[in-house]
């Protein structure tokens, strides 16, 4: 591995894109956030339903589930809406399950009570890292939805146990880099998505060699990069939530 690399964006190997989290982006959902990782923009909403899936009836606990989708022109060329095709792609199903798992990792579902938190992540513009941006933004939307429940007297305490955020890392031109945009993601040798809690626990690691297999040393370097990047994202979440932080 090389110690430095020339990235298309001009960023350092360990530098995130400009990240922004805009709360209360829409007025109807209990929680809504526009998350921006550079040119990737995702609208994340959290909606509360006072019911649970059939498999959780009579258990006295809640549930959190997620859906993910991309607008037809979120990418360079237009894609048909999945609804028009009559089914979701495997990629869509994989990503929305990942988002749900990531958020459930930091929720006490018993404390949530017999209700469901529906997370919707809609990609407005894609430039790499849509799933990691979705997780990072969805946490803030979920936090705001919980705050709404507390303010309404439906919860006495927050069921959120920690922060959760996600980032992509990869081996690009022989060097480990943080937060890949599309130009890097489409040409990298290794692509990895990492989900971690604020306390530093790993929720999920998805890593794939796109051509050249990666070594244990490269994997360790990628995880170190991801850990540093996620720490920055968690701090941003805390800064954005401010006094309302649970």
Swiss-Prot record:
Supply the Pfam families for this chain: RNase_PH, RNase_PH_C
Q: Which Gene Ontology BP annotations are present?
A: rRNA catabolic process; rRNA processing; tRNA processing
Catalysed reactions listed for this entry? tRNA(n+1) + phosphate = tRNA(n) + a ribonucleoside 5'-diphosphate
Task: Give the InterPro entries listed for this entry.
Answer: ExoRNase_PH_dom1, ExoRNase_PH_dom2, ExoRNase_PH_dom2_sf, PNPase/RNase_PH_dom_sf, Ribosomal_Su5_D2-typ_SF, RNase_PH, RNase_PH_bac-type, RNase_PH_CS
**Which residues take part in binding phosphate?**
91, 129-131
Q: Which GO terms describe its molecular function?
A: 3'-5'-RNA exonuclease activity; tRNA binding; tRNA nucleotidyltransferase activity
Question: What EC number(s) does the entry state?
Answer: 2.7.7.56
| Keywords, comma-separated and alphabetical | Nucleotidyltransferase, RNA-binding, rRNA processing, Transferase, tRNA processing, tRNA-binding
For whether the record's keyword set contains tRNA processing, the answer is: yes
Record text on subunit structure and interactions:
Homohexameric ring arranged as a trimer of dimers.
Q: What does this protein do?
A: Phosphorolytic 3'-5' exoribonuclease that plays an important role in tRNA 3'-end maturation. Removes nucleotide residues following the 3'-CCA terminus of tRNAs; can also add nucleotides to the ends of RNA molecules by using nucleoside diphosphates as substrates, but this may not be physiologically important. Probably plays a role in initiation of 16S rRNA degradation (leading to ribosome degradation) during starvation.
Q: Which family does it belong to?
A: Belongs to the RNase PH family.
Q: What is this protein called?
A: Ribonuclease PH
Originating organism: Burkholderia cenocepacia (strain ATCC BAA-245 / DSM 16553 / LMG 16656 / NCTC 13227 / J2315 / CF5610)
Gene label: rph
């Amino acid at each position: 591995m090389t110690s430095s690399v020339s990235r298309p964006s001009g960023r350092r190997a360990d530098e995130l894109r400009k990240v922004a989290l805009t709360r209360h982006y829409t007025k109807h959902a209990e929680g809504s956030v526009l998350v921006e990782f550079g040119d990737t923009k995702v609208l994340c909403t959290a909606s509360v339903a006072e019911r649970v899936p059939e498999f959780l009836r009579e258990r006295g606990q809640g549930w959190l589930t997620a859906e993910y989708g991309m607008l037809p022109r979120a990418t360079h060329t237009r894609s048909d809406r999945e609804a028009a095709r009559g089914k979701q792609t495997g990629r869509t199903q994989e990503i929305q399950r990942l988002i749900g798992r990531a958020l459930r990792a930091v929720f006490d579902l018993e404390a949530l009570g017999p209700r469901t938190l529906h997370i919707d992540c809609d990609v407005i513009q894609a430039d790499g890292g849509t799933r990691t941006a979705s997780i990072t933004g969805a946490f803030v939307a979920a936090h705001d939805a919980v705050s709404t429940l507390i303010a309404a007297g439906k919860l006495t305490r927050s069921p959120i146990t920690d922060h959760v955020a996600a980032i992509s890392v990869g081996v690009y031109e022989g060097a480990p880099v943080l937060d890949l945009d599309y130009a890097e993601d489409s040409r990298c040798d290794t692509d990895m998505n990492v989900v971690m809690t604020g306390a530093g626990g790993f929720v999920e690691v998805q890593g794939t060699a796109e051509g050249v297999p990666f070594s244990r040393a490269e994997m360790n370097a990628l995880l170190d990069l991801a850990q540093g990047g996620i720490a920055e994202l968690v701090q941003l979440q805390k800064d954005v939530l401010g006094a309302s932080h649970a």
